[in-house]
Design a protein with these regions (language model features):
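Secretory/endomembrane lumenal or extracellular ectodomains immediately following the signal peptide
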Residues: 1-72, 191-213
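Short alpha-helical scaffolding segments that buttress acidic/His motifs in well-ordered protein cores
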Residues: 44-47, 57-64, 77-83, 112-113, ...
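Helix N-cap / loop-to-helix initiation motif
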Residues: 70-71, 103-107, 155-156
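Short acidic alpha-helix initiation/capping motifs at coil-to-helix transition points
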Residues: 34-35, 52-57, 87-92, 127, ...
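C-terminal end-helix/capping segment
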Residues: 100-107, 176-206
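Acidic/histidine-rich alpha-helical segments that form the ligand environment
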Residues: 122-164
Length: 213
């Protein structure tokens, strides 16, 4: 379950109601969840808790889906890699699908997790993936050599668009995991695994040197 309250159809603000109508038809998505793409749809119902946040996020979607200088294939490489790098199954899964929609090959999509050793990417695609890793995995610490490689292929406008969109999707991946939305509603796998009954609590005692008499 998401960690925040979900806003139903009757309580949603006008912009959310309009999108609910598109996604869920006449259903209340809290009572009858599910979208045509197979997601529960609770990203929308949780973001609707704050109408301003909902509208701001939707404006971000409209930004990247609008008329941009950046090639949509490069955009989706950045978004999908951001989802993978941040560990968001929701963002990664949704943008694998979106990547097919803009014409990336199945090999390119399936190789995003291990792009460094894949041979299916052009120099500009590799530069975009490396730049995304610098932003997401290194917290914005993009090496000069990576930026120089990107500048060989993209204009300042295209780099600004890429930076904004990747940063936005890094944020969405973090929010999705934090609030346990959609496919990121999973338990943390880093927990203690119980030892057998009667086992010593000193798990590293076998490496101790025997004390000399």
């Amino acid at each position: 379950m998401p960690r925040l309250t979900q806003i139903g159809k009757d309580q949603a603000h006008p912009n959310a109601q309009a999108i609910y109508k598109l996604l869920f038809k006449d259903r209340d998505p809290v009572v009858q969840p599910g979208t045509d793409t197979g997601t529960p749809g609770n990203w929308w119902t949780v973001f609707a808790v704050s109408p301003d946040a909902f509208d701001h996020a939707v404006a971000g979607f409209q930004y990247y889906r609008g008329k941009r200088k950046l090639d949509p294939k490069l955009r989706e490489l950045g978004q999908t890699r951001a989802g993978w790098g941040r560990g968001s199954q929701f963002v990664y899964s949704q943008h694998c699908k979106a990547s097919r929609g803009v014409g990336l090959s199945e090999e390119q999509i399936q190789s995003i997790p291990h792009w460094q050793v894949a041979e299916c990417y052009s120099p500009v695609e590799r530069a975009v993936l490396a730049y995304t890793d610098g932003m997401v995995l290194q917290g914005g610490r993009v090496a000069d050599g990576i930026f120089a490689a990107l500048k060989k292929h993209l204009s300042d406008v295209e780099i600004m668009e890429l930076t904004y969109i990747v940063g936005m999707y890094d944020m969405h991946a973090m929010i999705s995991k934090t609030l346990r939305l959609e496919y990121d509603d999973v338990d943390d796998r880093i927990v203690e695994v119980a030892a057998p009954t009667g086992a010593s609590s000193d798990v590293m005692r076998m490496v101790d040197q025997e004390k000399k008499e």
